[in-house]
Amino acid sequence: MHRRTFCKSTVAAAIATTLPGCGSGSKDAGSTISAISMDGSELSIESAAVGELADSLQGHLFLQADQGYAEAKQVWNGMFDDKQPAMVVQCGAVNDVVNAVNFARERDLLVSVKCGGHSLPGKSTSDGGMMIDLSKMHSVDVDPDAMTLRADGGSLLGHIDGAATAHEMMTTTGIVSHTGAGGFTLGGGVGRTDRKMGLAIDNLLAATIVTASGDIVRASEDENPDLFWGLRGGGGNFGIATEFVYRLHPFNPTVFGGTLTYKFDKDFLEFYALLHETMPVEANIEPSFGPGEDGKTIATVEVTWCGDHAAGAKALAPMLVHPGFLSGDLAPFAYHDIQTGADGILGHGHQAYLKSSFINELTPAAIDVIVEFANRGAVGSWFQHMGGATSRIATNATAYPHRAAAFNFGIMYFGDDPAQNEAKVAAVREYYYAMEPHMAGFYTNLNDDDEKKTWGNYGENYPRLVELKNKYDPSNLFRLNANIKPG
């Protein structure tokens, strides 16, 4: 680790010119590093203290001028490529997380946490703060007899999928395999198997976190059950998760389904609403709406059946004879293929903006809005299929309250030209606000920064979450998330 001074033209340039050794790699005892506090004010941190932190780590500490910094600070959403943390603590063990948390708390330093770096609103990074990076902590172990899987906090969903399917087992994971397990799980965990197996949090048996006080705390139904309740949907508000233990289910890694296309219109959406009401929980049916080869909007439907293939062929047969059906077929295929199928298209570095919310019922009025805006073609939209096992748990049984949701509906811009960002973000928002009367809360993993909405999103569970925040993070050290403020 080179104890170099943090310099950032837009955040710290004004004071950087007054600090000794700025950008020079100085190791003088009196040199300082410029950083940002939790309230946004400027901090000066002694380089010697940063050096002591670096020496305490099994992993690595990167400052802006260090070789490897650019790669270490990288996050998924290219809209936040210009963010420059003062330091990246790339942890190699749980004690590294403890040391980083203690260092940040003692100095009131802004903290972000990165596992896969997939935070859509860029909460995995910051300007001038400390990024605590868990990406090198990704060991995964399966106990096939107990039907459980243990994963380090920096594990990616692909690590979990691969380990579980090797034993013909599975737990619910998401739709892009390079997503971090930590943020995915703590926010709820919506995926292709959730209708049959439940959300990720419904399969979470235990978690270990490092709290704001630097304590290592395990939470389960039997240990710290209040914290365990909050971790299941409360996001990263209470600490940094360094380990998860999940329940596994028997699973055939060869599933049934395929990709089908349909003429996009009101009739298709009414058909989709009917499919939701009638399909067994083994079926996961997720349409997206965008331009076809002729430029007209079509529905592209991803179908996954996690169960007996013959039963799936029979149940899904109506999808192949609908009047609006255009192309595609249903057949057995490797679950791994669909779980990794979007990894390239949704790779790192693109410009991405998304707003989403849950829908309890696809009403005629909601259908009219979707038809209007999807046909405009300015931005894409899609459904994640829910219900089934996700709805069999009481609203207050976990922090995640959205048990009545039939769908998660997303509206997204994804591209490579930053010059389009302003117009595309405006188009997403216009579509979203038109849909808002038909929505019922949002998935915190796809949240915006609206504090009022975060408060309302948890409903009757919110006061209990505030109590947990007061207990485990009274200074709101962990604030770069769907934040629950202490009170």
Regions found by a protein language model. Name each.
Residues 2-487:
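Soluble FAD-dependent oxygen oxidases
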